Amino acid sequence: GGKKILAVGDLHLGYEEALNIQGVGVGRMLFSEMIKDFEEIFDKIGKVDEVVLLGDVKHVFGSVLQQEKEDFRKLLEFFGERCKKIVIVKGNHDSIVGFFIRERTEVRDFYIVDSVCFLHGDRDFKEIWEEKITTWIVGHAHPAIELSDGVKSERYKCFLGGKWKGKKIVVVPSFSRYSEGSDVLRGDLGLVWGVDVRKFKVLVVGEKLKVLDFGEVGKIK
């Protein structure tokens, strides 16, 4: 009878506009594709109690682009119709995300629900080490796995799950289609705690939201 929570990895809204400003014409398809992806997820899981955004909601560090504002407002409306509350965990790109906020929306450095803590992963907080907290759900690292058949290699975003220092940790991939992610087989994920993920499981979400288990990071060739 617990809460039903959808945790969402780094969105990096405003990425297209940042590229367009730099002269890389990428159009405006990305946001509508993102909404389609979310529609597919909600079709499968139904309404939730809360949506938790795990930080780096916006892409451009320290400034607010018009497109970001517009997209963010639409996204909050979209989520607002499908949940009771939205929690935004601040990421390293989100220094000024506060003024976007509307009713039923909170901004936190980290967010604790029962024994689960949602946080970005770029900063440490003493509260997250309390004994009652058994699980961390984190963003920031953008995990992905690169698989090669000898001819071509493809990169797939993945979830990582495992135990470290007595905590169960789930690392959530970036939700942005432009962010390919960092290959977990090539070393450090950039999380503030320097987590050793070699024994963590790699889970890739495939077509029709089917979950594929690739086993432990350290055993993948």
Q: Language-model segments: which ranges?
A:
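Extended recognition/assembly regions associated with phosphoester-bond processing machinery
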Residues: G1-L53, K58-K221
